[in-house]
Amino acid sequence: MNDSQYNLIAEALLLAIEEAIEDSGVDIDYEGVGGLLTLTFKNNSKVIINKQAPLHEIWVATKFNGHHFVLNNDSWTDKRSGEEFWQFLSNAVSTQAETELTLSAQ
């Protein structure tokens, strides 16, 4: 994958996250600026998702730890655990929002 392809795919992922948050019906504020998406919850905790263009990765920081995701066969997966991005994000957001929700690209 070249840099242009990465940027298109990563920007599409960030947009899909915004849409999934909006569609969830849960009160989560989000702000996207320049490849960085910040989710802010009622309890003032945050999840920060950002592009790491030089590495062709997506980084996610929760209040607990950080994760690096790489694109493998059209699916973003955690470099350490192998967990799929949307499953991870659903769990992280559910924990920080203190309510169960499932996010996905639609």
UniProtKB/Swiss-Prot annotation:
GO terms for molecular function: ferric iron binding; ferrous iron binding. GO terms for biological process: iron-sulfur cluster assembly. It comes from the Bacteria. The keyword Repeat does not apply. GO terms for cellular component: cytosol. The keyword Signal does not apply. SMART domains: Frataxin_Cyay. Keywords: Iron, Metal-binding. Involved in iron-sulfur (Fe-S) cluster assembly. May act as a regulator of Fe-S biogenesis. Belongs to the frataxin family. This is Iron-sulfur cluster assembly protein CyaY. It comes from Colwellia psychrerythraea (strain 34H / ATCC BAA-681) (Vibrio psychroerythus).
